[in-house]
């Protein structure tokens, strides 16, 4: 198409506020306070108009809610690529709280005949919302008045495609309807060996008017992974069901319906590919598959190392140990995949679930220990593509499902839920979500990584929101007493606040950082160690929790070094080696007769590596060598295995993502130090 640039014009004075965009293929305008996505729309002057696009429509029980697009704004505007976001709500006066809100984003590239559409729904009511369906409609090419310009039905070609290894097509002649539905049972019975975060298959529908020489193909992004989904096409157009009719779906599926708890959100995407009438099935399928699994460039690990944007986790090839490298990759791959609209990107913890922490329900890890951050570090040091996709998929879930987007309790808003049932504790009684928020279970580094890798400003906003939530929690009485909480509580808080300070240079983060550091110093003076209450009459050392604090203090030290802080960190590491090591060279789980079993927590390896970094004394590395070897030689949980439908998810494999999230940085950080000392 030659050199084409995007042209964007904001509305003039005395006109309704809106944005007009041209990209060489499309010419459209979006307007505030509108009941439809487009105010005007043209694709090369034929077939499609503003009225060709209807929805989204949200069905709840017997009602259908219509959208109101309240405000459009430019997120990104350049000559090659542009992003427009519309925010709004579904119109219904019977909804509690602030109602059901949404955002819609339109991603447009210069000279390209497709629009990537993302739709994000927010349950800002006090209750659980169980949508009956969530649908978009794209009408078949017409005259702009709801009439097809084709004189004969034979001019309309419909096409439906779904793929596993190869795409299976079903073509409808004379405008006949074709389409399909993806359920848990469909996936349960279909063999697929792809890493699902990277790719599973595609799911598409097309309607083409041969007389007008124009058509449109719709592809739902990662439809299988985010079931239930449906798509159909007929002579009247394409129906895109981000949530298909759940009343009908429940007749053929035993999976529980999709239900949005109070404060929960979820984004789904689809591509609208406009084309001429001669576009082949191969070309439509090719674009659809590229949408599902686009080419992704990467930066060499050596560049990441030189840039010093990641921790010290890099080794030259001559120092790398093949067995260790293989083990780290296996551990990264060894997590369960949980298909489902509200589940993909997370997995339940088998241990928490078996303990009954979910009252019989699955206990979702909610990205405990910052699983995405571990994956982004693994991607940086290896360049393996799927590690990036693991991180991106987890962050997408995290930003929507694991963060509280609405609550009457200000201590919940923008915070991250601790591992719990139904992702946020559930809201059956209509009194908001009943999960727990604690500084020990709120992370931001993975969100900041995602922001740096993708440029999506929503991740930065989410990280800042979590940071503000942490500040609010630190002001509560629970966090004021010395030794009344575990070392990991304020330790994780310090880690998050340090990352935000490095990112934003906002002094509000540093003020609380200084307060936390002083709390640790006073804690040591009062008890002689970082003891914390465990039973009603006992205070003990918990090595892995103390290690969280050590790691966080070290992050702060790298930003704001001082001799006093260095001495405090070395003292804490020495306290671990003197009191938490078994006679056989491992670390105790917890310092209590009923819990002093051999530990396998790798967090203590990070503490040992920090001791070495600050002193140069290899004795600290020697304390950790048996724990390191035990961890590296352990078998990673299964990423593949039996499929089982539980609640609203299809679970494949058994490994909880928190295992890699917790262990990667300690293992890799210790590994780089020990390899340089020829201990490995």
Residues of each region from the PLM?
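Surface-exposed interaction regions enriched in Ser/Thr/Asp/Glu
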Residues: 1-7
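Solvent-exposed loop and edge beta-strand segments that line ligand/cofactor-binding
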Residues: 253-255, 259, 355-368, 423-440, ...
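Long, well-ordered core segments of solenoidal/helical folds
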Residues: 298, 326-345, 390-406, 457-478, ...
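Well-ordered alpha-helical scaffold segments within catalytic/enzyme domains
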Residues: 86, 120-124, 271-273, 315, ...
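Terminal, non-catalytic domain-edge segments
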Residues: 279-308, 313, 317-324, 515, ...
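Beta-strand/loop-rich accessory regions of lumenal/periplasmic or secreted enzymes
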Residues: 17-296, 343, 347, 366, ...
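Helix-terminus loop motifs that line ligand-binding clefts
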Residues: 386-436, 458-469, 492
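Low-complexity, Ser/Thr/Pro/Gly-enriched N-terminal "stalk/linker" regions
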Residues: 288-361, 403-427, 664-680
């Amino acid at each position: 198409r030659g050199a084409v640039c995007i042209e964007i014009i904001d509305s003039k004075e005395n006109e309704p506020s809106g944005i007009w965009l041209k990209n060489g293929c499309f010419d459209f305008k979006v307007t505030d306070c509108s009941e439809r996505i487009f105010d005007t729309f043209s694709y090369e002057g034929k077939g499609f108009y503003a009225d060709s696009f209807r929805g989204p429509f949200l069905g709840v029980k017997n009602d259908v809610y219509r959208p109101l697009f309240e405000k459009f704004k430019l997120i990104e505007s350049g000559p090659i690529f542009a992003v427009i976001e519309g925010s709004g709500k579904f119109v219904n006066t019977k909804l509690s709280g602030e109602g059901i809100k949404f955002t819609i984003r339109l991603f447009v590239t210069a000279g390209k005949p497709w629009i990537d559409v993302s739709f994000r729904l927010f349950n800002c009511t006090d209750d659980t919302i169980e949508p009956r369906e969530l649908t978009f409609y794209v009408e078949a090419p017409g005259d702009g008045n709801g009439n097809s310009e084709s004189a004969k039905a034979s001019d309309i070609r419909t096409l439906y495609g779904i793929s596993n290894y190869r795409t299976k097509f079903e073509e409808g002649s004379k405008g006949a309807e074709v389409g399909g539905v993806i359920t848990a049972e469909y996936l349960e019975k279909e063999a697929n060996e792809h890493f699902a975060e990277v790719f599973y298959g595609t799911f598409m529908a097309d309607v083409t008017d041969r007389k007008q020489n124009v058509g449109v193909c719709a592809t739902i992004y990662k439809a299988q992974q985010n079931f239930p989904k449906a798509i159909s096409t007929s002579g009247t157009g394409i129906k895109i069901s981000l949530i298909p009719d759940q009343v009908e779906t429940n007749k053929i599926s035993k999976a529980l319906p999709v239900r949005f708890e109070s404060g929960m959100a979820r984004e789904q995407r689809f591509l609208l590919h406009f084309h001429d009438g001669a576009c082949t099935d191969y070309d439509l399928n090719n674009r659809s598959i590229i949408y599902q699994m686009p080419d992704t460039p990467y930066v060499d690990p050596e560049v990441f190392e030189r840039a010093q944007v990641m921790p010290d986790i890099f080794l030259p090839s001559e120092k790398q140990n093949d067995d260790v490298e293989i083990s780290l990759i296996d551990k990264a791959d060894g997590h369960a995949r949980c298909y489902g609209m509200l589940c993909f990107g997370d997995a339940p913890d088998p241990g928490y679930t078996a303990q009954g922490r979910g009252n019989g329900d699955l206990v979702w890890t909610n990205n405990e220990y910052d699983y995405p951050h571990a994956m982004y570090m693994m991607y940086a040091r290896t360049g393996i593509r799927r590690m990036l996709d693991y991180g991106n998929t987890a962050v997408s879930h995290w930003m929507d499902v694991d963060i509280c987007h609405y609550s009457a309790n200000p201590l919940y808003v923008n915070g991250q839920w601790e591992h719990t049932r139904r992702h946020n504790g559930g809201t059956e009684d209509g009194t908001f979500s009943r999960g727990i928020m604690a500084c020990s279970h709120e992370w931001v580094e993975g969100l900041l990584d995602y922001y740096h890798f993708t440029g999506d400003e929503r991740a930065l906003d989410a990280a800042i929101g979590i940071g503000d939530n942490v500040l609010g929690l630190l002001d509560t009485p629970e966090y004021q007493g010395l030794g009344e909480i575990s070392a990991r509580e304020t330790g994780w808080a310090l880690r998050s606040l340090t990352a935000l300070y490095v990112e934003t240079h906002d002094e509000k983060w540093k003020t609380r950082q200084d307060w936390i550091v002083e709390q640790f110093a006073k804690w040591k003076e009062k008890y002689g160690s970082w003891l914390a209450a465990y039973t009603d009459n006992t205070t003990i050392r918990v090595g892995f929790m103390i290690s969280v604090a050590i790691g966080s203090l070290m992050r702060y030290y790298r930003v704001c070094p001082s001799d006093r802080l260095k001495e405090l960190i070395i003292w804490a590491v020495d306290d671990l080696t003197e009191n938490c090591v078994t006679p056989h060279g491992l670390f105790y789980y917890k310092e209590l007769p009923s819990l002093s079993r051999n530990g396998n927590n790798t967090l203590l390896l990070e503490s040992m590596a920090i001791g070495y970094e600050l002193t140069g004394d290899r004795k600290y590395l020697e304390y950790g060598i048996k724990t390191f070897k035990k961890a590296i030689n352990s078998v990673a949980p299964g990423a593949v295995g039996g499929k089982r439908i539980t609640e609203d998810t299809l679970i494949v494999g058994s490994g909880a993502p928190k295992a890699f999230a917790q262990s990667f940085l300690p293992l890799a950080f210790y590994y780089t130090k020990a390899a340089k000392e020829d201990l490995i």
